[in-house]
């Protein structure tokens, strides 16, 4: 709905350039076309006249009047007003919203999608949990946000590659192996010989039990079988890491999250990519040695201080494999890369960007893009839930799914802006009431399904063609408000993608559901008059389609009965 208004404005500017009112070198400024907060100021408003006045030295209000007079006529525009210092407010004719409602049903599942990404490749990395324990609620938020971002990017025409980076190397993995080995030897937390920095959750005992039993793990490309040898740390390492990878994959599948690529940090060392990346940085001239360590001149690229890459003992600091990993993304042809991380990783971003810039191979500044999410607080009965017996110290994603549902968990973890702290209220997520936002939205969808079922049961045949042709019969304000709300969906899909803020989809769906429930309570639908009934059912079906499309972007289901 916004694009035709913008196109009219551009045509008006061109007309003023052609007749000499505006200089021929006047380019259309980067003006805003937006929906005002209240409809009394129109359906759309623009600041274009004020921007043009700055470039030309004209009075903005007079220029607005001149521009309005130069606009082509449009059947969609009911009237145009000039407000304040030079805002131009457009009031649309209801026929524009009626036509958009018809477009919903014609485009079906494709409604709201666009081709702005031009099939370019974007890699979206998310979750990327260490395989040292069950996925916690923070990983769940990362999974929900990352998966929704991937869906949004696809809806905006991008070729998306979903990627999970396993940090299967380093000190935490060594602690995991020692923990499982100790359990396999009969030790338990609190024993004198229990390892320092060991993992204490019950899942460690489960891994040790499976290892001692000689169990096998079915991975995607191989079957891993325990050797049962408690002294073979390499075998325990291989078994424990893959056991937890398998457990994490199970939880992600239950959460309707999948990936195209699983990338192992260990492969960067195995394939020599870490050494190769370090050598490239040395060759670029952006490193130096001091105190027996190798340093990156990261201050040359915006970091607040230079960073140690290779310590005096020959080991690498943790951000070096991160540079090698992101270099691999660039080499795989990702024109755009988005990495979703917890906010606690904020300190590493500048050094990774610095390392990639120091390679001097054409990687643009700001590549990759980062989306950071804040912590999640889980509440039950008005009190914070802090512990899980299985994990030994945190609430797991599996806990939330089992206590609520996949749909509720996904919704609640997406519902706030990623960089905002989030409270997950288990009691609210389980409610079947309008206070529960996911229930409220799904209930709107189910209500339309119920309407269609009732019409069938009463032998009230629905003629969609007649309904599309008769939408002008719905002249009441609640029907128009619902059509207006429906028409916002494509804009929201585009804006949410541009800002990388999937919570905007959830917010919009609540507003659409509210508009529908209001319409439903104020408008008898299954009336005797067939023409009116078909028009109302058409509006209901268009609402259902947009709800379905939006819920699909969130990875949330569309139940036909509630």
Curated annotation (Swiss-Prot):
Entry superkingdom: Bacteria
GO MF annotations in UniProt: arginine-tRNA ligase activity; ATP binding
Motif ('HIGH' region): 129-139
Catalytic activity from the UniProt record: tRNA(Arg) + L-arginine + ATP = L-arginyl-tRNA(Arg) + AMP + diphosphate
Keywords: Aminoacyl-tRNA synthetase, ATP-binding, Cytoplasm, Ligase, Nucleotide-binding, Protein biosynthesis
First-listed, main subcellular location of the protein, grouped into a coarse class: cytoplasm
Gene3D superfamilies the record matches: Arginyl tRNA synthetase N-terminal domain, HUPs, Isoleucyl-tRNA Synthetase, Domain 1
Alphabetical list of PROSITE patterns matching this protein: AA_TRNA_LIGASE_I
EC number(s) on file: 6.1.1.19
Subcellular location: Cytoplasm
EC main group: ligase
SUPFAM superfamilies listed in its UniProt record: Anticodon-binding domain of a subclass of class I aminoacyl-tRNA synthetases, Arginyl-tRNA synthetase (ArgRS), N-terminal 'additional' domain, Nucleotidylyl transferase
GO cellular component: cytoplasm
SMART domains, A to Z: Arg_tRNA_synt_N, DALR_1
Matches recorded under NCBIfam families: argS
Summary of subunit composition and partner proteins: Monomer.
Similarity-based family: Belongs to the class-I aminoacyl-tRNA synthetase family.
Protein name in UniProt: Arginine--tRNA ligase
């Amino acid at each position: 709905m916004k694009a035709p208004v913008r196109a009219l404005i551009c045509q008006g500017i061109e007309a003023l350039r052609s007749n000499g009112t505006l200089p021929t070198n006047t380019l259309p400024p980067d003006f805003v076309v937006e929906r005002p907060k209240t409809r009394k100021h129109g359906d759309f408003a623009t600041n274009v006249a004020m921007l043009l006045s700055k470039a030309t030295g004209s009075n903005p209000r007079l220029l607005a009047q001149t521009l309005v007079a130069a606009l082509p006529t449009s059947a969609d525009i009911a009237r145009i007003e000039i407000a304040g210092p030079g805002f131009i407010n457009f009031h649309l004719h209801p026929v524009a919203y009626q036509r958009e409602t018809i477009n919903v049903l014609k485009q079906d599942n494709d409604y709201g999608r666009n081709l702005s990404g031009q099939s370019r490749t974007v890699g979206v990395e998310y979750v990327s949990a260490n395989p040292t324990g069950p996925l916690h609620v923070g990983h769940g938020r990362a999974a929900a946000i990352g998966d929704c971002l991937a869906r949004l990017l696809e809806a905006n025409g991008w070729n998306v590659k979903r990627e999970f980076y396993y940090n299967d190397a380093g000190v935490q993995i060594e602690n995991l192996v020692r923990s499982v080995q100790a359990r396999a030897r009969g030790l338990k937390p609190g024993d004198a010989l229990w390892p320092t920095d060991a993992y204490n959750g019950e899942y460690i005992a489960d891994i040790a039990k499976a290892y001692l039993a000689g169990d096998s793990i079915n991975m995607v490309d191989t079957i891993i079988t325990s050797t049962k040898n408690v002294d073979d740390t390499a075998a325990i390492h291989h078994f424990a890491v893959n056991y937890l990878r398998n457990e994490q994959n199970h939880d992600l599948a239950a959460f309707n999250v999948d990936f195209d690529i699983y990338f192992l940090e260990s492969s960067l060392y195995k394939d020599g990519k870490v050494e190769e990346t370090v050598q490239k940085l040395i060759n670029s001239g952006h490193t130096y040695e001091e105190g027996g360590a190798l340093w990156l001149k990261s201050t040359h690229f915006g970091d607040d201080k230079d960073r140690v890459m290779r310590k005096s003992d020959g080991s690498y600091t943790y951000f070096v494999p991160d540079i090698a990993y992101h270099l691999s993304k660039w080499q795989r042809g990702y024109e755009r890369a988005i990495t979703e991380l917890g906010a606690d990783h904020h300190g590493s971003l500048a050094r990774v960007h610095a390392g990639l810039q120091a390679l001097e191979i054409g990687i643009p500044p700001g590549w990759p893009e980062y989306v950071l999410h804040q912590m999640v607080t889980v509440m039950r009965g008005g009190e914070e839930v802090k512990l899980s017996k299985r994990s030994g110290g945190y609430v797991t994603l599996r806990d939330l799914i089992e206590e609520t549902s996949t749909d509720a968990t996904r919704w609640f973890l997406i519902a706030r802006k990623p960089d905002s702290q989030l409270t997950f209220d288990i009691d609210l997520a389980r409610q079947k009431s309008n206070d529960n936002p996911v229930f409220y939205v799904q209930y709107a969808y189910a209500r339309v399904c119920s309407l269609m079922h009732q019409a069938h049961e009463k032998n009230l045949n629905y003629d969609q063609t007649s309904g599309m042709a008769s939408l002008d019969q719905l002249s009441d304000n609640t029907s128009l408000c619902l059509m207006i709300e429906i028409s916002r969906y494509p804009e929201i899909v585009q804006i949410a993608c541009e800002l990388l803020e999937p919570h905007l989809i959830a917010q919009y769906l609540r507003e659409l559901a509210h508009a529908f429930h209001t319409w439903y309570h104020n408008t008898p639908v299954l009336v005797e008059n067939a023409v009116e009934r078909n028009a109302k059912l058409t509006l209901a079906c268009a609402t259902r389609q947009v709800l379905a499309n939006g819920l699909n972007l969130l990875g949330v289901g569309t139940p036909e009965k509630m």
